[in-house]
Amino acid sequence: MAPPPVRLEIPAIGVAARLVRLGLEPGGAMQVPGDFTTAGWFAGGPRPGQLGPAVIAGHVDSRTGPAVFFRLRELRSGDVVLVDRADGARLRFVVEGARSFSKAGFPTAAVFGPAPSAALRLITCAGDFDRASGHYLDNLVVFARLAA
């Protein structure tokens, strides 16, 4: 098993953040970081660098302003995502694209399911904000692959 990831850097959008471990909520949904300045990696799936999609989530904003993934929507194909692991290795991923999905129709298999190589998914909230529920209606998913 690969060492856990500890830090995320996305130079194109100015992200440099500590990574925390995320599990599942009692209802089965993936946890989100408790801190708006950190991102979290899903410990129930592959770790960055392992075969399959490693998933990292972060907040887009908070009541006080922008959060760690506020500018995630600005990423374009070819942008670089760097993940530092606990063993000192730095992994380089290249963005392949991004898509917004309704939370009600979230493509769990496409995001969390098997992949033919080491991949990375970055997830944050997007779309309209529902004031009644206190949540965004969509998720933005950035798809990236491990650079050779």
Enumerate the predicted regions with their spans.
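Solvent-exposed, non-transmembrane regions of membrane-associated and secreted proteins
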Residues: 1-77, 82-89, 97-148
